[in-house]
Regions:
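Short, surface-exposed loop or secondary-structure junction motifs
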Residues: 72-75, 127-324
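Active-site SXXK
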Residues: 39-42, 56, 62, 86-113, ...
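Short solvent-exposed beta->alpha transition segments
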Residues: 389-434
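Short, conserved catalytic-motif segment at the N-terminal edge
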Residues: 29-89, 109-114, 169, 314
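Short, well-ordered beta-strand elements
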Residues: 319, 329-345, 451-452, 461-467
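Short, gly/Ser/Thr-rich active-site loops of penicillin-recognizing serine hydrolases
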Residues: 343-407
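Exposed beta-sheet edge and beta->alpha loop/turn motif
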Residues: 429-470
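Bacterial N-terminal signal peptides
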Residues: 9-23
Length: 470
């Protein structure tokens, strides 16, 4: 499921965290202080969110450099999480379905611009929607599972055909190619196309063409075989209640859109293949990672099964995943040959994103030479706001309008008592709306804040906002 950039972590009870053994790697070993910082990011995130466990893999210089699992995989028997355990990766599965389509394209068996009607003629406006629009979520087909919980009907088995008989025959939510809207239905359709064109079950095709060549031995299809006693239990929470075992989706509901489970190490192997462009032809990787444009020319920040954006000034291919009991985050920085994989065993929780976005800056140097100066400026502005003042020459007319007398009083009364920040950290940077968005984490002994700024091309700030993290 897609989560907002500025998603706030839940304030939940602190868990006693159990560390598992870490595998050592002869090459691309991370510096000891970097490993310690990763451990702190992960343990802090689990403590703040109450998520039972996380499995983390880091790729550095194109090789697996770090594997570590944190917390308990099973709370009933306090089984420590280990790096070998398989977690459901949810919608991160979509990039494998997209890759299957691209591999069939390399064989000359289909085109990204083929109409869906060539393969499944009975679907709504099938002769207008293309495969490319399916994989980029620009088709208009309505999502069959936007909810963040398992409905009663989803506890029963289903087939892809039955899903499409309902959601594939509804009117489109918009004209194909005119909007971006996340829809699991797109990938069910794409999975059916893979099976029709290849003549094989989707997972068999993925096993032969992707998992076996990349030595991804842990991969399993949770639609066919549920996770076992040696794997983590998936958990949910009702509001701020205790973790409870999450219901398991009936067979078929996750087909092609979210059915895969694997170890963090195996997902990292996939990331390395993206970095090295070792599995598909260069033209396929170009399609995979190129931002899709709408008919009006606006970008979607999405390629084929992956988000395409900039993080700390670096090109990033990423996707999150969520199914019942599990969330995941997968970040790949192909130009820097870096990747971060985080798998967790609680749904509707922010730990996987918090860990991934906390670890990435530890591996990436900002390519913006102004970053240290902007960090110092942000801290100075924050400290001035603690006293109810600002240097108005730093801001645009819009921002100066926002910082009215009442606003400054509220900033001072709420921020002043916090005192001097223990840490003031630059965590994210990207372009949005023609402006540079910079995100900062501000840490105090008993609380954390998030600040974010929008900088205009002339260097003036259009926005300086602050919210609570816990």
């Amino acid at each position: 499921m897609m989560r907002a950039i500025l998603c706030l972590a839940f304030r939940l009870a602190t868990l006693v965290l159990v560390f598992s053994g870490m595998k050592a790697f002869a090459q691309s070993q991370l510096p000891a202080d970097t490993e310690q910082k990763i451990d702190k990011v992960a343990t802090d995130a689990l403590a703040k969110t109450g998520v039972p466990s996380a499995s983390v893999a880091v790729v550095n210089n194109g090789q697996i450099a770090y594997l570590h699992a944190y917390g308990n995989a099973r709370l009933d028997s306090e089984v420590p999480a280990t790096p070998e355990m398989r977690y459901s990766i949810g919608s991160v599965s979509k990039q494998f379905t997209a890759a299957a389509i691209l591999l069939l394209r390399e064989q000359g068996k289909l085109s990204l611009d083929d109409k869906v009607g060539k393969f499944i003629p009975t679907l709504t406006r099938a002769n207008e929607v293309t495969i490319r629009q399916l994989l980029s979520h620009t088709s208009g087909y309505q999502d069959y599972w936007p909810q963040d919980y398992v409905m009663p009907m989803m506890l029963r088995p289903v087939t892809a055909e039955r899903i499409l008989d309902t959601w594939g025959h509804k009117p489109l939510d918009f004209e194909p190619g005119t909007k971006w809207q996340y829809s699991n239905t797109n990938y069910v359709i794409a999975g059916v196309i893979v099976e029709k064109v290849s003549g094989e079950p989707l997972l068999q095709y993925l096993q032969q063409k992707i998992f076996a060549p990349l030595n991804m031995k842990s991969v399993t299809d949770t639609d066919k075989a549920k996770l076992g006693d040696t794997d983590p239990t998936g958990y949910l929470r009702y509001a701020l209640g205790p973790p409870r075992p999450a219901p398991v989706e009936g067979s078929g509901w996750l087909f092609a859109a979210g059915e895969l489970a694997m170890s963090a190490e195996d997902l990292a192997r996939w990331d390395i293949s993206i970095i090295n462009q070792s599995l598909m032809k260069p033209a396929s990787y170009q399609e995979f990672q190129t931002e899709i444009l709408l008919k009006n020319g606006l970008g979607t920040r999405y390629g084929l099964g992956v988000m395409v954006r900039s993080e700390l000034g670096h090109r990033e291919l990423s996707h999150g995943g969520e199914v019942s009991g599990f969330t995941s985050e997968n970040l790949v920085f192909p130009d820097e040959r870096v990747a971060v994989v985080v798998l967790t065993n609680q749904d509707a929780a922010a730990a996987s994103e918090a860990i991934a976005t906390g670890v990435a800056p530890l591996l990436l140097a900002s390519d913006d030479p102004a970053t240290p100066q902007k960090l110092a400026q942000a801290r100075q502005i924050f400290e001035a706001l603690q006293h109810g003042t600002i240097d108005r020459s730093l801001f645009t007319d819009n921002a100066n309008f926002y910082f009215n007398e009442q606003a400054l009083k509220d900033f001072a009364s709420s921020l002043g008592p916090l005192g001097t920040p223990k840490e003031f950290i630059h965590t994210r940077q990207l372009l949005r709306g023609g402006m540079k968005l910079r995100v900062y984490t501000i840490k105090f002994p008993k609380s954390e804040l998030r600040a974010w700024t929008y900088e205009m091309p002339d260097g003036k700030l259009e926005q300086f906002q602050i919210s609570a993290l816990n």
